[in-house]
Amino acid sequence: MATTSLASAFCSMKAVMLARDGRGMKPRSSDLQLRAGNAQTSLKMINGTKFSYTESLKKLPDWSMLFAVITTIFSAAEKQWTNLEWKPKPNPPQLLDDHFGPHGLVFRRTFAIRSYEVGPDRSTSIVAVMNHLQEAALNHAKSVGILGDGFGTTLEMSKRDLIWVVKRTHVAVERYPAWGDTVEVECWVGASGNNGRRHDFLVRDCKTGEILTRCTSLSVMMNTRTRRLSKIPEEVRGEIGPAFIDNVAVKDEEIKKPQKLNDSTADYIQGGLTPRWNDLDINQHVNNIKYVDWILETVPDSIFESHHISSFTIEYRRECTMDSVLQSLTTVSGGSSEAGLVCEHLLQLEGGSEVLRAKTEWRPKLTDSFRGISVIPAESSV
């Protein structure tokens, strides 16, 4: 390929040279010939040889044309060299390594922790962890062939305008991974009562196999036209039933129910929170993880500096729309920065209707073994 292009370029150069006069020189312009006409009769002697300015000018090559041809040759060579060197490169396995467990029902996906997923303490946040869980869950549904038109909807669900909505999520974090780490998310689904679906997750360190995070999420069906909850049709049950496993990552007794909170009992309140276009998912529904961002808006920075979230329970009570205006409320209990903290959260519409309740438990960062580095000074306080 490169040889062919070079030959073509040289042929172009030859054609240009042949277009010149018989001596291979491009004739000068008529204007130049007129200016040199009188000089033809007046020849100078240089070293005993007659010298004509006109003849000398005719013998000079057209350097601009020569430069253009050389540029064409090198451009063609560079292009062909690039084509020969480039080859499609497979995706790194740690980024898109999807596979199933021994029984074909436990889905696994690996994630490399990116620089934009870590914070000032060099570890990931609870939001980054939940993003990995959500991505693994959707790819699980896609891999088993039950992903229809939308996030997590089957074909029969799409026919009936049904979607899954999360009712409750509980996350327990033992350790947060750091930038450059690779984690593996295991996920599987099971039944929860007669009309619910349970999604369970384990997050492991790919190097050690250590369990970093356990999560369970309960979903129910909602009709997108009526915006009301719906029973699971038998046709849908037939689609999802074969993928169910009777196993849990977190037992129900481990989950602590969030407590009621109101304006008078809250320590911190922030209003004026509104959904944006980028907060909506493919189902035209506010992404569940966006609610977590709103909840944490009212947690003081001093807590983030000194503590990690060790567990997170969130109960969704109603959805919000693009024109909703919300308030985030938080109350803190637990004492000094050396001890664990508990926060109760409420997200409500400005009119007072509850959107969700949540509870977060926090442990001091000093108790974490983070590569042998103490990231928070001992004198820090809440």
From Swiss-Prot:
Enzyme active site: N283, H285, C320
Chief location of this protein within or outside the cell: plastid
Keyword list, A-Z: Chloroplast, Fatty acid biosynthesis, Fatty acid metabolism, Hydrolase, Lipid biosynthesis, Lipid metabolism, Plastid, Transit peptide
Domain of life: Eukaryota
Tagged with keyword Transferase: no
Xref: PANTHER family: OLEOYL-ACYL CARRIER PROTEIN THIOESTERASE 1, CHLOROPLASTIC (PTHR31727), PALMITOYL-ACYL CARRIER PROTEIN THIOESTERASE, CHLOROPLASTIC (PTHR31727:SF2)
Function according to Swiss-Prot or TrEMBL: Plays an essential role in chain termination during de novo fatty acid synthesis. High thioesterase activity for myristoyl-ACP.
Name of the protein this chain belongs to: Dodecanoyl-[acyl-carrier-protein] hydrolase, chloroplastic
Organism (species): Cinnamomum camphora (Camphor tree)
